[in-house]
From Swiss-Prot:
Organism (species): Fowlpox virus (strain NVSL)
A Pfam family recorded for this sequence: Pox_P4A
Subunit structure: Interacts with P39/A4.
Protein name: Major core protein 4a precursor
Subcellular location: Virion
Keywords: Virion
One Gene Ontology cellular component: virion component
Family: Belongs to the poxviridae protein P4a family.
UniProt GO molecular function: structural molecule activity
Lineage, top ranks: Viruses, Varidnaviria, Bamfordvirae, Nucleocytoviricota, Pokkesviricetes
Role, per record: Core protein 4a is the most abundant virion protein. Major component of the virion core that undergoes proteolytic processing during the immature virion (IV) to mature virion (MV) transition.
Length: 891
């Protein structure tokens, strides 16, 4: 069994630092087809956070959120008593605002294993909950977190803080709803307003309580709650002086008297009778009688089950009107327990209401055990695969429940293990980022990398306009005219350029000159600048590509050009004729943002990739983007590598520091703009990380990091070829000229071989997608339509795919063989040597070729392993009966 104490976690990192480390270090260790546990798609947040941050709602399942809110409402009401207040450090204000009163008070139960993590990446109430959980006892955290017990949940050892009551209710909704009628200094009742009109249920309650009040209090009551207005709005006739029975023995229900003592005791009751006799009694004694009679069953249930500790009195005392003698009725005579309502009347009534509803409503039961609260057994955790254990440790906070001195506590798993305590349960808390759990984000990233994007396989738009209708000579003449244009008013510049173009076009002959990608950028900049457009340039690096963005404003449109011509004294008809005469040029101008060639120019709508955030005025601009791969020397940390003199120094060097630094900044930008999702992150991941992920996914060994050192260090980074080249150069700083040339030849050949391999991989993946689609059609035909396709068809397809791969490999070897000859002459020319003066011997050429051969062989071996995995995947999809009829050739 592995050493559990060595499990990898990223607990101390947060925000972009955490995300960067996760993607750059952990993601490459996962296979592309790594299956993430569906249970991790949802996580945990305190339900109060979802009230103010709706994007967090998706973290919880619908049932889990509603049940948690139900329990939180109950626990909040029960905690308004002093001895429970410290266990629910939240206060809901009159306007529905929820504020924290957390002051690190754990009620005397201090966790013996302290936690050093700040949890600043968590929403506010979730952060408080985690602090309570890691600083106090588990029961405290469950009370504040709205824990709902599952029938199979393991028991915990801790002081009993609450009776674990949970049923469907709207307490939190009512307490936090901001649109209410009334004033808190007169009543705690919160009648809800919908579109400014009081709900009928609340209005009915108010009218029944109003009938119990004496006239002067009734008038104040009407003014505070706007009774007349809401009665009219609800089509209810208001009785100004209601006549009701207020005899405690004969009145229809005590409900509204109970409600009076719960919310409206600041108003004055009308005369109260008992057996036809008007009585004089103070409010606390009357409340004791009314509440005890109304909740007699609930009081007995509380006593029988020892749910709460209530205070009682032995008798009910009142005085008949016009009498000096008190009459006493004992609890024994009434056959009930009489509550002492001298203090805390609203709280006691709320408590009894909760117990009453719990007896008649269905108890909340979660569908499954909670990973956050109940977790998994320690043995189950220890028996997990290492990759699953590492994934949990880096994408989730891992807590451990443990018992100490008869109390159950919860601390970080690593802290518990270091303290040499034995965990009883491992609780999993998926980390959250911008409304998603990190496991969900990783799944999206893997899916987007699996789904081949335009970045990996360029799609050329056949509708792009790459010419302006002029021949080579005509284009150069027009280009020179643009260079000579001085700064002029936009309307004048537009007219002069269109007229000049039309004049050149009349005498121009020959086929159109197609603008090369190298000239395109310069031409559109000069064209729009000369026409008076404002061209703003932004440059940034995304993934391993350089993005140059041109914002041309105002937006290029035919309407704008027409307006400029009319402003330059052209009539509507003249403007249309001039635009028609310059049709090819105008079409080119209108199509500049339609290109989609990855290595040339294309339009991306996301403002992030322009290097800045668009303002409202820039929405009316035309965006053109030029995208090109970053040179390999600009991607690597040349200074760091060259300054390393030992193996350990090279291993500690961040080889791809420049593009990793750009990646980290791009992550910060995504977080700042709230555009975090799998697609956006997959787009900005640098190629050195993508290379490692793809290689790992195929299970391929990519050779050694340092080929010519005695200690051979394996690495999974295909892009790390460049490290080997630079390290070889470091071995001997006084190389002979011939060795220097040979090393440079190797550099050139390796880069060329990688470039050619990229082209072959793209061709292969395009072909593989067609074969895979064909295999999927066969799969669905057999699976869903129950039609049997013979093995001959399946084997024929596999043989064709194998032949396709062999043809691609043969083409690659031919390309490298020819490029090798070119590279030799190119390197000699760049070093300033003359072949006649410094002849290169056959021995030098042979040495360069021998060094290059294993590099090329390594790439072909990697390609073979990759295509073999594709071949096996297609075979598995089609599932021929004779699986050995055709096999993949590893040679």
């Amino acid at each position: 069994m592995m050493l559990i104490k060595n499990i990898v976690t990223l607990d101390q990192l947060e925000s972009s630092d955490y995300l960067y480390k996760l993607i750059s270090s952990v993601l490459p260790s996962l296979c592309l087809d790594y299956k993430i546990d569906p249970k991790l798609a949802n996580g945990y947040v305190h339900a109060l956070d979802t009230i103010y941050s709706p994007e967090l709602i998706s973290i919880l399942t619908d049932g889990e959120r509603s049940q948690q809110l139900d329990t939180l409402g109950i626990n909040y009401i029960l905690s308004r008593k002093n001895d429970l207040g410290i266990y629910f450090p939240i206060n809901i204000r009159e306007n529905g605002e929820i504020v924290s009163t957390w002051n690190k008070n754990t009620g005397g139960y201090t966790n013996p294993i302290p936690c050093t993590i700040s949890f600043n990446d968590l929403p506010p109430f979730t952060k408080i909950l985690i602090q309570i959980r890691t600083m106090g006892c588990e029961a405290h955290a469950r009370y504040f977190g709205g824990y709902v017990e599952h029938p199979s949940s393991p028991n915990i050892l801790s002081p009993k803080i609450n009776p674990n009551i949970s049923f469907a209710n709207s307490y939190i909704h009512s307490l936090t709803y901001p649109y209410i009628e009334g004033r808190a200094d007169y009543s705690t009742y919160r009648p809800l307003l919908i579109n400014g009109i009081m709900e009928k249920k609340d209005l009915a309650n108010l009218l029944n309580v109003r009938a119990l009040l004496e006239p002067m209090s009734r008038a104040i009551f009407d003014a505070i709650f706007k009774i007349q207005f809401h009665c009219n709005a609800n089509n209810i006739v208001l009785v100004q002086n209601p006549n009701i029975d207020t005899d405690l023995i004969t009145m229809q229900t005590l409900k509204y008297l109970v409600m009076y003592f719960q919310h409206f005791s600041g108003f004055t009751l009308r005369d109260i009778y008992l057996g036809g006799v008007r009585i004089r009694v103070d409010n606390s004694m009357l409340a004791s009688y009314v509440v005890s009679i109304y909740f007699s069953k609930e009081i007995k249930y509380i006593e029988d089950n020892k749910l709460f500790s209530l205070d009682y009195i032995d008798q009910f005392v009142f005085r008949p009107d016009n009498s000096n003698l008190n009459i006493t009725v004992t609890a024994q005579q009434l056959g009930i327990r009489i509550l002492n309502m001298t203090s805390n009347r609203p709280y006691i009534i709320n408590l009894l209401n909760i117990v009453s509803k719990s007896l008649v409503r269905h108890r909340n039961v979660p569908k499954e055990i909670s990973l956050f609260w109940d977790g998994m057994s320690y043995d189950e955790y220890k028996n997990m695969k290492f990759i699953d254990m590492m994934f949990l440790g880096t994408t989730c906070y891992l807590f451990a429940l443990y018992n100490k001195n008869g109390i159950t506590y919860c601390s970080m798993l690593n802290d518990v293990l270091r303290a040499e305590e034995t965990p009883i349960r491992i609780c999993v808390f998926p980390r959250i980022l911008k409304g998603k759990t990190i496991p969900t984000l990783i799944r999206e990233i893997l899916e987007n990398i699996n789904n081949i994007s335009v970045r990996d396989f360029p799609k050329y738009d056949t509708h792009d306009v790459k010419h302006i209708g002029l021949s080579d000579a005509g284009f150069m003449l027009f280009f020179q005219f643009l260079r000579l244009m001085e700064n002029k008013e936009p309307h004048i510049a537009v007219k002069e350029i269109l007229m000049a173009y039309t004049g050149i076009k009349i005498d121009d002959k020959g086929s159109p000159y197609y603008i090369t990608p190298e000239s395109y950028r310069t031409f559109i900049f000069m064209l729009f600048k000369a026409m008076g457009f404002n061209v703003r340039v932004n440059r940034t690096t995304i993934s391993s590509h350089s993005y140059t963005s041109y914002y041309v404003s105002p937006r290029v449109s035919k309407r704008y050009l027409t307006n400029m011509l009319q402003k330059a004294s052209c009539s509507q008809s003249e403007a249309e004729k001039l635009l028609s005469s310059a049709h090819d040029l105008v079409s080119f101008m209108l199509s500049v943002n339609n290109s989609s060639n990855r290595d040339s120019y294309r339009r991306i709508n996301r403002s992030f990739f322009g290097g800045f955030k668009e303002s409202a005025s820039e929405e009316d601009a035309t965006l053109v983007q030029f995208i090109s791969p970053v040179n390999i020397l600009d991607r690597i940390n040349v200074k760091g590598i060259l300054s390393a003199n030992a193996l350990n120094e090279i291993m500690d060097t961040d080889v791809f520091l420049p593009e990793n630094a750009n990646f980290k900044e791009n992550l910060k930008q995504l977080l700042k703009e709230d555009t975090i999702d799998g697609k956006s992150i997959a787009h900005i991941i640098p190629l050195n990380t993508i290379d490692r992920l793809i290689v790992s996914a195929g299970g391929v060994s990519v050779g050694e990091l340092l080929e010519n050192l005695d200690e051979r260090v394996p690495d999974e980074n295909a892009t790390n070829e460049v490290i080997e080249l630079i390290t070889n150069a470091l071995k001997d700083r006084n190389m002979k000229d011939s060795n220097f040339i040979a090393t440079n030849i190797l550099n050139s050949i390796t880069q060329i071989s990688e470039k050619q391999m990229d082209g072959i991989k793209k061709i292969t993946c395009h072909g593989t997608m067609m074969f895979k689609e064909l295999a999927m059609h066969i799969y669905f035909t057999e699976r869903y339509f129950k039609a049997k396709i013979s093995d001959d068809v399946k084997i024929s397809i596999l043989e064709k795919y194998r032949d396709f791969i062999e043809l691609s490999k043969s083409l690659y070897k031919d390309l490298i063989g020819i490029d090798q000859i070119k590279s030799v002459l190119s390197i000699v020319h760049r070093t300033g040597r003359n072949i006649d003066d410094n002849p290169i011997t056959q021995e030098d050429i042979q040495k360069a070729y021998n060094i290059a051969r294993p590099k090329i062989l390594k790439l072909t071996n990697y390609y073979t392993e990759m295509t073999k995995s594709y071949f096996e995947n297609i075979k598995r999809i089609m599932n021929p009966e004779d699986a050995n009829a055709v096999v993949f050739d590893n040679e």
